[in-house]
Amino acid sequence: MARLCAFLMVLPVLSYWPTCSLGCDLPQTHNLRNKRALTLLVKMRRLSPLSCLKDRKDFGFPQEKVGAQQIQEAQAIPVLSELTQQVLNIFTSKDSSAAWNATLLDSFCNEVHQQLNDLKACVMQQVGVQESPLTQEDSLLAVRKYFHRITVYLREKKHSPCAWEVVRAEVWRALSSSVNLLARLSKEE
């Protein structure tokens, strides 16, 4: 219930968030794709989170790298692109297809893939922007390690239904953080 309430609070941010003030031109449909992806993740839920309490785990979301106030615009887009790529990797794995409704999973992956294409195009527009390579690499590494922990967790739990439910909720949180970061960067400009 708490996650549903949090989701409903994020929807207005998604609806009004301008996408063209980040130093690149994200299409106007990008925020709609974010909204649809988050909605699909909610619909994908197969188990009550209460039934999986024993399986919960803190994956150590790198909030200081993805959601921190000090993250720079030029650094944000590559980091968000990496985060989106990692989400796609998890949900397009062979083990993922057995865990979810095929129609919802395909729709979710299509939305995430389109977001990734938007972000990659944005990264290409920023090629001339110089950001401290060490800072950016540190953030990218933090995102990769975070998703590695999620992948290891799924393997250790043998891709159980509860493990997938925990991961679904965690990915919802990660995508919500990315939405909030983009909204914050848009407001700063």
UniProtKB/Swiss-Prot annotation:
Where, subcellularly, is it found? Secreted
Which Gene3D superfamilies has this protein been placed in?
Answer: 1.20.1250.10
GO terms under biological process:
defense response to virus
Q: Which residues are glycosylated?
A: 101
InterPro entries the record matches:
4_helix_cytokine-like_core, Interferon_alpha/beta/delta
**SMART domains for this protein:** IFabd
Q: Which SUPFAM superfamilies match?
A: 4-helical cytokines
Q: Which family does it belong to?
A: Belongs to the alpha/beta interferon family.
Official protein name in the record: Interferon alpha-5
